[in-house]
Amino acid sequence: MSANTDEFDVVIIDTGCANLSSVRFAFERLGANVLVTDDKASIKAAKRVVLPGVGSAGAAMASLTEKALVELIQGLTQPVLGVCLGMQMLTLLSKERGGQALDCQAHDCKCLGIIPTEIDELNSQTLKAEGLPLPHMGWNQLTFSNPSQVHPLFAGVEAGSYVYFVHSYRAPLSDYTLAQCRYGEDFSAAIGKDNFMGVQFHPEKSAAVGAQILGNFLKMQ
C-alpha cells in the first residue's frame, strides 16, 4: 500500500541489496522523517529520493528490474541522490562483473543511463606503483574544479574536506563531475545532471562533512 509521502522529507528506495539503516539514521539525526520503501507510487510522489546500494552493479540493477523500478527512477523529477553504488547505477554502464540476471558476468552492466558517464575499475597498475591497496577504503579529500561555484549539494563544504570511501570502481572526471578525489588517479567523487546527483563516498559515515551534505540535500526542492 502506498504511504502518504507528504509527511516524509526523504524516501529511500529499498533496492533489496543495500544496508539501508545507516543512511536512514543519518537523515533522522538531522531531524528528517524518512520512509524506506519499494512502492512505486510512494517513490514517484516523494519530495526527495535516495538511491542506496552496496555490492555489484549487476545484482543491484537486477533487483531494480525485478521490482519494476527502472523506468520509474529514470522519470523522477524531484531531487534524487545516489549513494556509493547508487551513484554508479545512475550512469550509462558499469564494467563491474557480477549479477547473472543481467548477464553481467561476461558483459558490461547496463545501468540507469541518466548521467552520461561510465564506471570502470580504479587503475590497478597506478595503485600498485604508488603502493596503494584496492579497494580504496578510508578517509580522503574532496576537491572542486571551481571552488567559487560549487554545486548546492556541497554548499558550506570546504575544499580539502575529508569523507569516507569504500569502493573499487569509479566514474572518471567529466563535465558531470561535481567534486573530485585522488587515489592513484583523479576520479569523480560526485556527479550530477539536472535533478540527479550521486556521491561515491558514504556521507552517512563522513561525520560533520557528510551531515552538511545530507542537510544540503534536504533543502533541495
Swiss-Prot record:
<dbReference type="GO" id="GO:0016829">
    <property type="term" value="F:lyase activity"/>
</dbReference>
<keyword id="KW-0315">Glutamine amidotransferase</keyword>
<keyword id="KW-0368">Histidine biosynthesis</keyword>
<keyword id="KW-0028">Amino-acid biosynthesis</keyword>
<dbReference type="GO" id="GO:0005737">
    <property type="term" value="C:cytoplasm"/>
</dbReference>
<dbReference type="InterPro" id="IPR017926">
    <property type="entry name" value="GATASE"/>
</dbReference>
<comment type="subunit">
    <text>Heterodimer of HisH and HisF.</text>
</comment>
<comment type="function">
    <text>IGPS catalyzes the conversion of PRFAR and glutamine to IGP, AICAR and glutamate. The HisH subunit catalyzes the hydrolysis of glutamine to glutamate and ammonia as part of the synthesis of IGP and AICAR. The resulting ammonia molecule is channeled to the active site of HisF.</text>
</comment>
<protein>
    <recommendedName>
        <fullName>Imidazole glycerol phosphate synthase subunit HisH</fullName>
        <ecNumber>4.3.2.10</ecNumber>
        <ecNumber>3.5.1.2</ecNumber>
    </recommendedName>
</protein>
<dbReference type="Pfam" id="PF00117">
    <property type="entry name" value="GATase"/>
</dbReference>
<dbReference type="GO" id="GO:0004359">
    <property type="term" value="F:glutaminase activity"/>
</dbReference>
<dbReference type="GO" id="GO:0000105">
    <property type="term" value="P:L-histidine biosynthetic process"/>
</dbReference>
<keyword id="KW-0963">Cytoplasm</keyword>
<feature type="domain" description="Glutamine amidotransferase type-1">
    <location>
        <begin position="9"/>
        <end position="221"/>
    </location>
</feature>
<keyword id="KW-0456">Lyase</keyword>
<feature type="active site" description="Nucleophile">
    <location>
        <position position="84"/>
    </location>
</feature>
<feature type="active site">
    <location>
        <position position="202"/>
    </location>
</feature>
<dbReference type="InterPro" id="IPR029062">
    <property type="entry name" value="Class_I_gatase-like"/>
</dbReference>
<keyword id="KW-0378">Hydrolase</keyword>
<dbReference type="InterPro" id="IPR010139">
    <property type="entry name" value="Imidazole-glycPsynth_HisH"/>
</dbReference>
<comment type="pathway">
    <text>Amino-acid biosynthesis; L-histidine biosynthesis; L-histidine from 5-phospho-alpha-D-ribose 1-diphosphate: step 5/9.</text>
</comment>
<dbReference type="GO" id="GO:0000107">
    <property type="term" value="F:imidazoleglycerol-phosphate synthase activity"/>
</dbReference>
<feature type="active site">
    <location>
        <position position="204"/>
    </location>
</feature>
